[in-house]
Curated annotation (Swiss-Prot):
Protein's name in the database: Cyclin-L1
Other facts noted in the record for this chain: CCNL1 is amplified in several HNSCC. May play a critical role in the formation of loco-regional metastases and an unfavorable clinical outcome of HNSCC.
Localization in the cell: Nucleus speckle; Nucleus, Nucleoplasm
Cross-link (Glycyl lysine isopeptide (Lys-Gly) (interchain with G-Cter in SUMO2)): K339, K347, K362
Originating organism: Homo sapiens
Domain topic, free-text comment: Contains a RS region (arginine-serine dipeptide repeat) within the C-terminal domain which is the hallmark of the SR family of splicing factors. This region probably plays a role in protein-protein interactions.
Length: 526
């Protein structure tokens, strides 16, 4: 009894018609019949006879396209070239191994069947070809050793590369190849369900020619055999029945040799074959002679490219990089990798506008406290503008005062100016905001301007350093404003400077008698 998925068993009753019987099914099931007379007992049932068939070993139409190789990204012309090249290797190796033609044909049919279940991208066609011819030699009762098969394929590889033939060294590479062939043979058996029987049309061709009374024409017989051997490179042996293939080979040979055959009715109708099937087989066979010879190197590169692409797709599906490292997810979560738009380095020479804004924000509460003491809103706006340029004016006034003063008491004056002028400036401005109302300037009074100049000359001898700092402050204030408001603010600064100088003169005169109180007050205000 058969144990393959493509085998069926049929049983017939031997004696009485009352015995139950069942016909064989096409799905590989075994039918049983019990009889009262003698027969074959299988298990607990008695059978009259058991027949094994493989009528359903053909590939269905839905499996012909797309093939597993096409699903892995290999195009149909490349797959067809690989099938042709694999069958040519099996045929050439069978000749060198002195195998019968039936064994070589069996190996090629097994090769086609296997690659309709597996992909050329995932399995090396050369290793599978070795396994198929080794398995076919055992099936056709002409076994060959694996070492001979490997040596023959090594010799064919050297001839294909136009290299000097050299024997294969028995090293680790040879051992690995031998193990791969053994594993591939086991894989072929598993994929085919151990149903490796192949019905060849060789004998069928001779039988049909005898019916047609053409068996004595050796040229016709040999030509039909040649067409059949060439059709082994195509997929017709896994699509059509061997009887149909035999009729197609006879049809091609008779047309090539211009031998007439019966047409009323057509001779192939006698053997249960249609004209459409014969024409399709003839087209597939004749197409071989119009194709270019397959390029082994280009096919290997194409398969290797698809193999790398398939491996990268698998790693990407697992979330890994091509080198095997885990890929960082950019869809969600925290990523330690910096964004390409974020600045990596901040130059120290460039001044960031954010830092300037932060500095002004920090100084803003002090300005608000000083401006809150004034009952007028207009003074507050001017004080804000003057505070923004105060830091720059301080640095400029210090450098200018150091360069202009040549007295031996320069360091003492600088210290006094740092401690005293800050406190005096803050007190004078706060008092001016709180005590004096907002005054309108008289632009047409030359007597006041002359009086101001005389007071400046008198106070310059006593407080030269303070006058220099006040002038630097007025200059820094005037530089920050536009040209339209420069004249107006300069005149307002004269009145304010006059009041500040008078009060600072009084405080400095008192500080001669009370020096410690002024410095302490300056530290407190700072």
């Amino acid at each position: 009894m058969a144990s393959g998925p493509h085998s069926t068993a049929t049983a017939a009753a031997a004696a009485s018609s009352a015995a139950p019987s069942a016909g064989g099914s096409s799905s590989g099931t075994t039918t049983t019949t019990t009889t009262t007379t003698g027969g074959i007992l299988i298990g607990d049932r008695l059978y009259s006879e058991v027949s094994l068939t493989i009528d359903h070993s053909l590939i269905p139409e839905e499996r012909l396209s797309p093939t597993p190789s096409m699903q892995d990204g290999l195009d149909l012309p490349s797959e067809t070239d690989l099938r042709i090249l694999g069958c040519e290797l099996i045929q050439a190796a069978g000749i060198l191994l002195r195998l019968p033609q039936v064994a070589m044909a069996t190996g090629q049919v097994l090769f086609h069947r296997f690659f309709y279940s597996k992909s050329f991208v995932k399995h090396s066609f050369e290793i599978v070809a070795m396994a198929c011819i080794n398995l076919a030699s055992k099936i056709e009762e002409a076994p060959r050793r694996i070492r001979d098969v490997i040596n023959v394929f090594h010799h064919l590889r050297q001839l294909r590369g136009k290299r000097t033939p050299s024997p294969l060294i028995l090293d680790q590479n040879y051992i690995n190849t031998k193990n791969q062939v053994i594993k591939a043979e086991r894989r072929v058996l598993k994929e085919l369900g151990f149903c490796v029987h192949v019905k060849h049309p060789h004998k069928i061709i001779v039988m049909y020619l005898q019916v047609l009374e053409c068996e004595r024409n050796q040229t016709l017989v040999q030509t039909a055999w040649n067409y059949m051997n060439d059709s082994l490179r195509t997929n017709v042996f896994v699509r059509f029945q061997p009887e149909t293939i035999a009729c197609a080979c006879i049809y091609l040979a008779a047309r090539a040799l211009q031998i007439p055959l019966p047409t009323r009715p057509h001779w192939f109708l006698l053997f249960g074959t249609t004209e459409e099937e014969i024409q399709e087989i003839c087209i597939e066979t004749l197409r071989l002679y119009t194709r270019k010879k397959p390029n082994y190197e280009l096919l290997e590169k194409e398969v290797e490219k698809r193999k790398v692409a398939l491996q990268e797709a698998k790693l990407k599906a697992k979330g890994l990089n091509p080198d095997g490292t885990p890929a960082l997810s950019t869809l969600g979560g925290f990523s330690p990798a910096s964004k390409p738009s974020s600045p990596r380095e901040v130059k120290a020479e460039e001044k960031s506008p954010i830092s300037i804004n932060v500095k002004t924000v920090k100084k803003e509460p002090e300005d608000r406290q000083q401006a809150s003491k004034s009952p007028y809103n207009g003074v507050r706006k001017d004080s804000k503008r003057s505070r923004n340029s105060r830091s720059a004016s301080r640095s400029r006034s210090r450098t200018r005062s150091r360069s202009r003063s040549h007295t031996p008491r320069r360091h003492y004056n600088n210290r006094r100016s740092r401690s005293g002028t800050y406190s005096s400036r803050s007190r004078s401005r706060s008092r001016s905001h709180s005590e004096s109302p907002r005054r309108h300037h008289n632009h047409g009074s030359p007597h006041l301007k002359a009086k101001h100049t005389r007071d400046d000359l008198k106070s310059s001898n006593r407080h030269g350093h303070k006058r220099k700092k006040s002038r630097s402050r007025s200059q820094s204030k005037s530089r920050d404003h536009s040209d339209a408001a420069k004249k107006h603010r300069h005149e307002r600064g004269h009145h304010r400077d006059r009041r500040e100088r008078s009060r600072s003169f009084e405080r400095s005169h008192k500080s001669k008698h009370h020096g410690g109180s002024r410095s302490g007050h300056g530290r407190h205000r700072r």
